Amino acid sequence: MISNFRVLGAGVWGLAFSDYLLKLGHNVEIFCRDTNLSTKDISGLKLSRVSEKNIMSLDTLNAQKSSGEINIIAVSSKGFSELLNKHESYFSTLNELVSLTKGLDHLSGKYFSDHVFDMFSNIKKYGLISGPSFAKDLCFEKKISVSFATLDTEFSKLMVEATKSSHFEMIPTTYIYQIEIAGIIKNIAAILCGMADKYFSKGIHSNMIIKKA
């Protein structure tokens, strides 16, 4: 069944997941600050379906009407709260929300799931997508699986069915906090890998950090 998605953010994962959804035949709108695809750092990705016709300015989000689209947050952890605050009127119209972003709110220290529920009583269903996985692997159709954490069984079934393919699957779970904690550890590991690659030869310590994380 064809679904309508809105991806809020156009980082590497946001673009890769949008491209994958388009390959499956879904309708996808991508909202971001910079709508020029050529300025984005996507040299390592193989985007076959995403084009600038799919991309809209994030400044127009508050003016958009919600018509049953599945909204997926795909901004950085630092930009999560900013997105919610700046576009509060839009999020106030939603019943469900999915996030590729994991971590803690930088101001309150709350889990992002708690932050969403505290801000928006209208959002009844919240889902979290988490690896471990790499955006480029999804683009190159390598076989990967990710977790989809939500407390709503029907929402879980909807996302699992809408995104499954021969090389990608979502594993449903209800352990939202545990997935968020794992995401925090993964973010810390990514920072450490970047530091290790900068100060030592690339890859020497990164693999060890990834395994320990």
Report residues per predicted region:
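Internal alpha-helical scaffold of NAD(P)-dependent oxidoreductase catalytic cores
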Residues: 27, 90, 115, 119-125, ...
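Flexible, glycine-rich phosphate/dinucleotide-binding loops
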Residues: 14, 37, 106, 135, ...
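Short, charged/polar "capping" segments at the starts of alpha-helices
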Residues: 36-41, 106-108, 156
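Rossmann-like NAD(P)(H) cofactor-binding subdomain of soluble oxidoreductases
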Residues: 56, 63-143, 159
